Design a protein with these regions (language model features):
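Ferredoxin-reductase
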Residues: 1-46
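Short coil/loop residues immediately preceding or within conserved phosphate-binding loops
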Residues: 9, 66-67
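A short, basic/flexible loop-to-alpha-helix module at the beginning of a structural domain
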Residues: 54-64
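Conserved S-adenosyl-L-methionine
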Residues: 66, 90-97
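Conserved beta-strand elements of the Class I
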Residues: 69-72
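Ser/Thr-glycine-rich phosphate-binding loops at phosphate-binding pockets of nucleotides
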Residues: 74-80
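Histidine-anchored nucleotide/phosphate-binding helix
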Residues: 80-92
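Reductase modules of NAD(P)H-dependent flavoproteins
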Residues: 100, 107-215
Length: 215
């Protein structure tokens, strides 16, 4: 947004699929946040400033094909995955596309109902072909799934709940986006397993959103 004649900018992931004619973002209201305190009050017709080119490291072309594609998110880190789970290309090279998403409280699971009904949706259900699986979790309230998604993978509870095989190097791949501690923990977890990070030159076993990690 333009504030006092100067652009006030923050990095946001695009949550809408690449074939849509609109752009969707997912944000939380930060108390007294310089941008979000203003962003929450915009109205139809108001202008927002966007870059002319999207950048990022969560790119399917940076990953190997495989059995299961895991999307691992905390908080608003789910935004790029909201775009990908509605993308045709996402389902072409994997048997399952599995989204693990944790937030602090239930109300922050803003896309929960949509994601739970994705396979049955009259439009996106034709894209997912039943391949999409969703594991929401909450860390600070009672919920059907509680705790960090890292722990759910470590103890195997997520695999049992979803009826899928445990993550295995050479068969499965992952995309990571969320808080810095979660990103770094999963990065170490996969590297300790012998997995390689993918990039634009070499397809790998996992990718993560570096704008969260390298600050």
């Amino acid at each position: 947004l333009e504030v006092e004649g100067k652009p006030l900018l923050r990095a946001y992931s695009v949550a809408s699929p690449n074939y849509e004619e609109y752009m969707e973002w997912f944000s939380i209201k930060v108390p007294n946040g310089p941008l979000t305190s203003r962003l929450q009050h915009i109205q139809p017709g108001d202008e927002v400033i966007t870059n002319s080119k999207a950048v990022g490291t969560l790119v399917l072309d940076n990953l190997k094909s495989g059995r299961n594609l895991y999307m691992l998110a905390t908080g608003t880190g789910v935004a790029p995955f909201m775009s990908l789970v509605r993308g045709v290309d996402t389902y072409e090279n994997y048997d399952n596309v599995i989204l693990l998403w944790s937030t602090r409280v239930v109300k922050e699971l803003a896309y929960k109902e949509f994601l739970e009904g994705l396979n049955d949706h009259e439009i996106w259900g034709e894209i997912t072909q039943g391949k999409f699986k969703f594991y929401p979790s909450v860390t600070r309230e009672d919920f059907v799934n509680t705790g960090r998604i890292t722990n759910a993978m470590y103890d195997g509870s997520v695999y049992e709940k979803l009826g899928v095989e445990p993550f295995e190097k050479g068969k499965d791949v992952a995309m990571i986006c969320g808080s810095m501690p979660m990103n770094l923990e999963f990065k170490k977890y996969f590297e300790d397993m012998g997995c390689k990070e993918g990039n634009s030159q070499t397809r790998g076993d996992f990718v993560l959103e570096k704008s969260f990690v390298e600050k």
